[in-house]
């Protein structure tokens, strides 16, 4: 069975969202449905329809999060023995050999990825190209705009 790699921080964030949806959002939606029922005919009641739609999306998200947490494998970067290679959870500083621009990224699970915050998904082309590589290695990354060469400058395990 395939598992979903996740950092401890990512799992905690999902658990917090799940708690909010179950304990707060659900009761807010139930209250909205109850109030909307008082407006009469449910077939032509826009407030009721909107509340039922919110309920559907909320329950769908709850199921999605529960499934992800059930199938996740929380990876603690500090316990990974490969201290000289790029692995899930490591923070990497790379240099684009064409533009000479340096960037630092952390490889995280799909749900945690946020490119603006330099958090890249384990399933991204950049991560896939970096996994298993060592400091000072040059890697070719296939991107939609062509192959880009990067040099790995530093690997941190934070």
Swiss-Prot record:
Keywords tagged on the record: DNA-binding, Transcription, Transcription regulation
Gene Ontology BP, a term: DNA-templated transcription elongation
InterPro entries: GreA/GreB_C_sf, TF_GreA/GreB_CS, Tscrpt_elong_fac_GreA, Tscrpt_elong_fac_GreA/B, Tscrpt_elong_fac_GreA/B_C, Tscrpt_elong_fac_GreA/B_fam, Tscrpt_elong_fac_GreA/B_N, Tscrpt_elong_fac_GreA/B_N_sf
A GO term, aspect molecular function: DNA binding
Superkingdom classification of source: Bacteria
Function: Necessary for efficient RNA polymerase transcription elongation past template-encoded arresting sites. The arresting sites in DNA have the property of trapping a certain fraction of elongating RNA polymerases that pass through, resulting in locked ternary complexes. Cleavage of the nascent transcript by cleavage factors such as GreA or GreB allows the resumption of elongation from the new 3'terminus. GreA releases sequences of 2 to 3 nucleotides.
Name of this chain's protein: Transcription elongation factor GreA
Organism: Wigglesworthia glossinidia brevipalpis
């Amino acid at each position: 069975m395939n598992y979903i790699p996740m950092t401890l921080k990512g799992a905690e964030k999902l658990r917090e969202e799940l708690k909010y949806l179950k304990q707060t959002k659900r009761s807010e939606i139930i209250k909205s449905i109850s109030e909307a029922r008082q407006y009469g005919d449910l077939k032509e009641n826009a407030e009721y329809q909107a509340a039922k739609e919110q309920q559907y999306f909320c329950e769908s998200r709850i199921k999605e999060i529960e499934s992800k947490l059930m199938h996740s494998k929380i990876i603690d970067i500090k316990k990974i023995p490969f201290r000289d290679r790029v692995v899930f959870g490591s923070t990497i500083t790379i240099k684009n050999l064409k533009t000479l621009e340096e960037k630092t990224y952390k490889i995280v699970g799909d749900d945690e990825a946020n490119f603006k915050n330099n958090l890249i998904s384990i399933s991204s082309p950049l991560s896939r190209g970096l996994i298993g590589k060592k400091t000072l290695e040059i890697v070719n990354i296939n991107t939609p705009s062509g192959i880009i060469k990067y040099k790995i400058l530093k690997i941190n395990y934070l």
